[in-house]
A protein has these predicted regions:
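Membrane-lumen/periplasm interface segments of multi-pass, membrane-embedded glycan/lipid transferases
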Residues: 282-359
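Membrane-interface transmembrane helices that cradle and orient dolichyl/undecaprenyl
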Residues: 168-171, 210-228
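Transmembrane-helix motifs of polytopic, lipid-linked glycan transferases
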Residues: 145-171, 209
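Membrane-interface alpha helices of multi-pass inner-membrane proteins
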Residues: 225-241, 246-252
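Interfacial juxtamembrane loops and adjacent helix segments
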Residues: 43-148, 299-301, 318, 330-333
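Multi-pass, polyprenyl lipid-linked donor-dependent membrane glycosyltransferases
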Residues: 28, 150-153, 174, 179-209, ...
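Perimembrane helix-loop-helix junctions
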Residues: 216-219, 245-271, 278
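Transmembrane-helix signature of polytopic, membrane-embedded enzymes
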Residues: 2, 138, 142, 163-186, ...
Length: 389
């Protein structure tokens, strides 16, 4: 119990510190995710991915906030960190003052900047919309910091509790489970993912809880476990479109075991909860996910056609490197030697795991982990191309 309380305290301290120390808009695509939250909080309804724009408040803040060179390639009008820190203290202080004094009424006025994150499912943004509305009278930097803290605290606690349950299913005893959780909470990429405004803070813990629910369904099939798994997956589908890749696993568990009642229950729940959002995408954009790539014609047949031409060793290494350490929108990373050492250690652990005996829960976790790695690469490519295109 003492170790668990220390882990919770460690998570809360990291959540708050990372949220307040991260520069404004340094989180992955953060101003665009925030604009989604702001549109919902202002009662303007769900955004249209083809026409949604940032508010003038957010647009003005982007011009007053320093950004990385990677962001400057996409938005040449922003000030780079190098330029910003070459200014005298008085000029930097004036820029911060102007940032704090941006009129809050500009939140109601659209800017010229398109919101390329408007295609995302709405659940995570809806949960942040109420706090954003309650904090509307505060300056933009304060609101962003508070929303980050809310997201990071909620996401880390959900992830911690879900990971504990998953470790229990995998029969990982203490102190190994505690050490693994400590390593997880010490991972920079975890906080880069959770401690910024977006939908990742909810998607990551939901993925873990979905695995927990799928393991329960696999071990103890029944109507209740099927309903819980379907609700967890529906929540994921309303947070990130990549949860579509988990649907075959849920359906497969029911079909392989010929649990037709459970299949009917899961189908009704998924269609009833997540179906309207994806039906909206089909009606509006003609594609299921609504993403920029899908709307541009990059579908599954296209991906399969070009797959043989991909340099897969480079893709795998890039995926590993991105997942180990990516310094937010600055895209900084560790040295190659450090990453090689971490990768070699992880590979050795994986080989030891392969050589051991496995329960069903472990194999379902492995399947979803492999799928998640592929989708993580896809996601990383999206936020790289979005800022640099």
């Amino acid at each position: 119990m003492k170790a668990r309380l220390l882990l919770i305290a460690y998570a809360l301290v990291n959540a708050v510190l990372y949220s307040v120390l991260l520069p404004l808009w340094e989180g992955f695509d953060e101003p665009f995710h925030f604009a989604y939250v702001q549109q919902l909080s202002d009662g303007q309804g769900l955004p249209d991915a083809r026409t949604a724009r940032l508010s003038r408040e957010v647009g003005a803040s982007i011009l007053l906030t320093p950004a990385s060179q990677a962001v400057k390639q996409n938005l040449p009008q922003v000030t780079s960190y190098t330029q910003y820190f070459s200014w005298p203290v008085s000029r930097r202080s004036e820029a911060r003052r102007r940032l704090r004094d941006i009129p809050t009424e500009l939140r109601w006025q659209p800017s010229e900047l398109l919101n390329y994150e408007a295609h995302q499912p709405p659940l995570a943004y809806t949960l942040l919309a109420a706090p954003e509305r309650l904090l509307a009278r505060f300056s933009l930097p304060v609101r962003v910091a508070m929303l980050r803290i809310i997201a990071a605290v909620a996401g880390s606690l959900l992830l911690l509790s879900g990971a504990e349950r998953l470790f229990s299913q995998l029969e990982i005893p203490d102190p190994y489970g505690t050490v693994a959780l400590f390593c997880l909470l010490s991972c920079q990429m975890m906080w880069a993912t959770l401690a910024h405004i977006g939908n990742d803070w909810l998607a990551v813990p939901i993925a873990v809880w979905a695995l927990v629910a799928l393991n329960v369904l696999g071990k103890s099939p029944g109507r209740r476990s099927a309903a819980v798994a379907a609700v967890a997956l529906a929540a994921g589908l309303l947070t990130k479109a990549y949860f579509l890749s988990f649907v075959p696993l849920l359906v497969g568990l029911c079909v392989v075991r010929r649990r037709w009642h459970e299949l009917a229950i899961t189908s009704v729940i998924l269609c009833g909860l997540a179906g309207p959002w994806y039906a909206r995408n089909l009606v509006r954009y003609g594609v299921l996910t609504g993403t920029q790539e899908a709307r541009a014609g990059v579908d599954l047949p296209t991906v399969l056609r070009v797959a043989p031409t991909v340099d897969w060793p480079a893709v795998v290494w890039s995926s590993v490197r991105v997942s180990l350490w990516t310094g937010n929108n600055s895209f900084s990373t560790f040295s190659a030697n450090t990453l090689n050492l971490i990768t070699a250690t992880s590979l050795a652990a994986l080989l030891l795991w392969v050589a051991s005996r496995h329960a069903t829960a472990e194999w379902s976790w492995w399947f979803c982990w492999a799928r998640g790695l592929t989708l993580w690469r896809e996601a990383s490519q999206r936020w790289r191309s979005a800022w640099r295109s």
